[in-house]
Amino acid sequence: MNWKYFTVTLALSGVAIALPAKADQLDTIMSAKTLRCATYADVPPFSSPDPKTREMVGFDVDLCKAIANELGVKAEIKPISVEARVPEVKLGRVDITVANLAYTLSRAEQIQFSDPYYVAKEMLIVPADDTGKKKADFEGKRLASTKGSTSELAIKLNKSDPLTFQDTGSAYLAVQQGKARGLVANTMTTTLLVNESKTKGKQMRMIDEPMLLEPVGIGMQKDQPALTAKINAVLHKLDDAGEINKIWEKWLGPNTEYKMTRNEKVVPISELKFDPIP
């Protein structure tokens, strides 16, 4: 026998045996009887402290609790910053991130996304007397947004000229003062501003065609196929039962200040027609 070969082989085998396999996160969740959910620390109506109880409340909080209930475990809400949404789940400090997390190519390289449960939109609002009807009508035109935002990216992708500000209020004021032809922001913000303009300032209207589509899903660690499959199955079940719509109506629906309607169904991201954000 070649003892040198045997010794090296045995040593290598020992190294291989010593390396732990990646733990099955779904098994860990079920054993701990706890689903650790990362949500926004203070971004209503998604997740923010209740002024009276100081408990976290909002759309994302209720969705996390609904998922945990389907799994038969307790939901543990962990408030985090906007910037921590991807790192927290990537590093395994939480099991899932439920924080209005839009799909982007860079995020998808780091974490696993569930099937989207709604599609966020970057929308354009303009003065009511503006003749533009679709986003192509605003190519080369100056549009306002917050600096470094998805809204600014949407303007650039439309080949329009971005005029950016540190906050939405300043960007909106620029449109009211005629310094920009329109404002690009998310659906909630633009809806609020259009409603506000009915009684204050220059009346605005929304262009029907979205400037950009952003599928929103749940973030998980990569290489956890059992957890991914289970979360997707739960989302589809909640959607089919009308539970996601109930949560939506409570926090974002027509009877709230946001007056938003959810028309989407939970579907694989591959079935959506959209241009992924880098």
Where is each model-derived feature located?
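Periplasmic-binding protein-like
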Residues: 41, 119-126, 195-235, 254-278
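Short helix-initiation/N-cap motifs at beta->coil->alpha
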Residues: 61, 76-87, 147-148, 163-177, ...
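Flexible hinge/capping segments at coil-to-helix
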Residues: 126-142
